[in-house]
Amino acid sequence: MRSLHILFILVVVTWLGFPLRAQEAISIGTRHTLFSHVLNEAREYWVYVPATRPGEKEESYPVLYLLDGDSFFHSVVGFTRLFSTSKVSSLPPCIVVAVLNTNRTRDFTPTCSAARRDGTVRPGDKPEGGGAGQFCRFLTEELRLAVEQDLPVNGQHLLAGHSYAGLFTLHVLLNYPSAFDTYIAIDPSLWWDKGYFQKQVERQVDKVDFSGKQLYVAFATQPRLDRKLIHFPLTDDFIGSAVPRMEK
């Protein structure tokens, strides 16, 4: 048995010693850093640009601004490459700009709040958040400028976010509708600040011009108590009352 162990170790060491010619890095994007004067901090973002085949004329592309970029960059790039090349898909190729987080609660929430999902505030809970307006300025005034200077863009802008970032996406649509052309909100945190966004929708939705805008909303169905009691009712209200009024 000892001789077998020695043989196994020798094989592994020998294998590790060989140059593996097939081990070349596969790159799907580039890393960038931009200092934001709006946020007063450096922000990292990753960029994917569709490849141009040899002999093809370089094209210009829509830009998808992906929030929580460090979590979703690889999967979203994979989806865009798959569906933009599929014969049954009408999704055009697009540039993906994945924005990495430094403080997602601060950046993605429209108000400062200590309320939990169920609306309660317990002793010791501290208010946080409320920086969505500033973060929107960073995206549209600073990051977009850097992207458009360096990349082959066609002037179409998409914004996609999940959870807190989904709430941010809806917040931008309601308050700054001209900022983007297409909004994709995945399972947005409508419970934030005791359902603040839904109340804001009721006050503002009829005063906002959504013409030419596209909104895609998806909600998870994970069986969790707070989803049944809090998340789903807010979702039903949003889809039932707000979305039809946005379509007018």
Q: Could you say what each language-model-derived stretch is?
A:
Residues Q23-K248:
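Non-catalytic cap/lid and distal C-terminal segments of serine-dependent acyl enzymes
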Residues L7-G17:
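Bacterial N-terminal signal peptides
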Residues M1-I6:
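Positively charged n-region of N-terminal signal peptides that target proteins for export
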Residues F18-A22:
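Sec/Tat signal peptide C-region and signal peptidase I cleavage site
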